[in-house]
Amino acid sequence: IFRIFATMQVLRLWFFWVCSLHFITTPMLVKTHAIVLRSLKYGDNQLITDLLTEAFGRVSFVSSIPRTQKAKIKKQLFQPLTLLEIEFDHRPTARLQRLRDARMTYPFTSIPYSEAKLAIALFVAEFLSHATRDEQQNVSLYKYVETSVRWLDGAQHAFANFHLAFMIRLSRFLGFYPNLNDYTRGCLFDLRSGCFVASIPMHNDYLQPDDAAQMANLMRITPQTMHLFGFSHHERNRCTQLAINFYRLHIPNFPELKSFDVLRAVYGE
């Protein structure tokens, strides 16, 4: 009797193990919204694309490069910051997912046709690809990015400071938004703690008063008020570098952004 009981227990455990394995490996059909961050040609006929999705956060996909105009998924869909609705079989253990279908949900009216907006879009897409590298599902963050992209495309003027407002406000969703409450003229900014201080901290990651004042200005910029901030080319580029440095301290292995050079060239040094 004991042997029969033991055998039944083993069979029961085996059954649950098989069921759980089936659950883990069986793909689940998913439809979600997504934003294109970057794409890279892989081999002769494949494309690897990094997307920020509403349902799963960051996801990497592989797809075949379409050879004809009749192809279901067109290469043009994978330009930086394109807003999509995608359908795919989600395999939790797979490094690369495979798209079933993709369609554009918001055709751009100005970003691809404006040199200045395109430079900003390329910069923001590269920035996001590093800032959200390990991001899981975060619907609030996704909605913020989507709304911001739509705003940039629809803006008629006064959008040169868009990326500055976007970078600083994104940090709120990532958990290290700076604290403006303690700012007073002449104080320093502690990059590690993200707050303004009256005395030099016990490390070298801080901003002198002039740069600290610029950081305070960055935190006041919104899409509605950015036209009030008349930065010179030099000041805007300096503020961009300050924001990048802030992210590099809070996100491991955050690199210098190659597209920053393009942004500098478009807006001047």
What is each PLM-predicted segment?
Residues 23-269:
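Non-catalytic alpha-helical scaffolds and adjoining flexible linkers that form interface surfaces
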Residues 14-17:
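Tryptophan (W) side chains
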